[in-house]
Swiss-Prot record:
Pfam families: RRM_1. Sex determination switch protein, which controls sexual development and dosage compensation in females. Sxl protein is only active in females: it is inactive in males throughout development. Acts as a mRNA-binding protein, which specifically binds to a subset of pre-mRNAs and mRNAs and regulates their processing and/or translation. Disulfide bonds: none annotated. One of its GO terms (cellular component) is ribonucleoprotein complex. CDD domains: RRM1_SXL, RRM2_Hu_like. This is Protein sex-lethal. NCBIfam families: sex-lethal (TIGR01659). Residues 127-205, 213-293 form the RRM domain. The gene is Sxl. The embryo-specific isoform is not expressed in the pole cells, which are the progenitors of the germline.
Length: 354
């Protein structure tokens, strides 16, 4: 149907639809183009236009055989295996200075709406990534083009309000291999896209599997770096995510960090080995505990400051009988109102009514 049956046609896609063909788009301009026009992200499109899917792993014939090519090819045609290295070379200079101000002109595959795309709940956390702090006007196609330069992707979607299409500012990107997901975190985490600094990390599954894996660490050296934090805590397990808290004005470390491990046992081992231990270059023993315990202690301290009794406090004494009567029979009435009521209702037996 889409083959090169017309002698004057330039469609050499081997049976694939023409580049940019979108059956579900109904002819809208967004679905009819395989590349992003300048300023495209400023246009308003419906959620149907911005949500799309790509061929599943079972339907692909090769690494880069998406319709319309794959990867970021600025000024070049994506889609060949030889072009992957060039695409990465095009991306790395942009990320070296933590700036990616413009994503227009990227080579993208055609897309269409797919309501059956299942994201983080069915995929391994070793390949599924969560991308936070996305620009409000960033589209799924831009996000796909950005991450497709790293490697082949199973699914890619920005989470939106299903009625209005409003972006919630985060997305899930699922790679086909663990190596590509690791490289995506290393290359794309922290880059700036339209004045927004992206945060790329593994998407964590819900439930019991992630309980007691996040550590709250204090008394770290004020010169601590990410590499030094990896050296200290990486001995005890696989670190999924880490965050050194910094002063908002100076940008220097505050001596506090969060470290999340892949398994609960790894976090417990780190607590046993590092709590009350002075690290290299430090002057105080570390305080390492579960982040949940820190949150509970902080909440209890705040509640005590504002005068809210704790959960273990004894219950207040019961009200006196006249107040109980007032609350049960004539709630909100004054004593005069009660007397007036009794005069106008001489046969009303309050005790019997109660």
């Amino acid at each position: 149907m889409y083959g090169n049956n017309n002698p004057g046609s330039n469609n050499n896609n081997g049976g694939y639809p023409p580049y940019g063909y979108n059956k579900s788009s109904g002819g809208r301009g967004f679905g009819m183009s395989h590349s992003l026009p300048s300023g495209m992200s400023r246009y308003a499109f419906s959620p149907q236009d911005t949500e799309f899917s790509f061929p599943s792993s079972s339907s692909r014939r090769g690494y880069n055989e998406f319709p319309g090519g794959g990867g970021i090819g600025i000024g070049a045609n994506g889609g060949s295996a030889n072009n992957l290295g060039g695409n990465m070379c095009n991306l790395l200079p942009m990320t070296s200075n933590n700036s990616l101000s413009n994503l227009c002109g990227l080579s993208l595959g055609s897309g269409g709406s797919d309501d059956h795309m299942m994201m983080h709940d069915q995929r391994s956390s070793n390949t599924n990534l969560i991308v936070n702090y996305l620009p409000q006007d960033m589209t799924d196609r831009e996000l796909y083009a950005l991450f497709r330069a790293i490697g082949p992707i199973n699914t890619c979607r920005i989470m939106r309000d299903y009625k209005t299409g409003y972006s919630f500012g985060y997305a899930f990107v699922d790679f086909t291999s663990e190596m590509d997901s690791q490289r995506a975190i290393k290359v794309l985490n922290g880059i700036t896209v339209r004045n927004k600094r992206l945060k790329v990390s593994y998407a964590r599954p819900g439930g019991e599997s992630i309980k007691d894996t996040n550590l709250y660490v204090t008394n770290l050296p004020r010169t601590i770096t990410d590499d030094q934090l990896d050296t200290i805590f990486g001995k005890y397990g696989s670190i999924v995510q880490k965050n050194i808290l910094r002063d908002k004005l100076t940008g220097r470390p505050r001596g506090v960090a969060f470290v999340r491990y892949n398994k609960r046992e790894e976090a417990q081992e780190a607590i046993s080995a590092l709590n009350n231990v002075i690290p290299e270059g430090g002057s105080q023993p570390l305080s390492v505990r579960l982040a949940q315990e820190h949150g509970k202690a902080k909440a209890a301290h705040f509640m005590s400051q504002i005068g809210v009794p704790s959960a273990n406090a004894p219950p207040p004494p019961p009200p006196p009988p006249h107040m109980a009567f007032n609350n049960m029979v004539h709630r909100g009435r004054s004593i005069k109102s009660q007397q007036r009521f009794q005069k106008t209702h001489p046969y009303f037996d309050a005790q019997k009514f109660i």
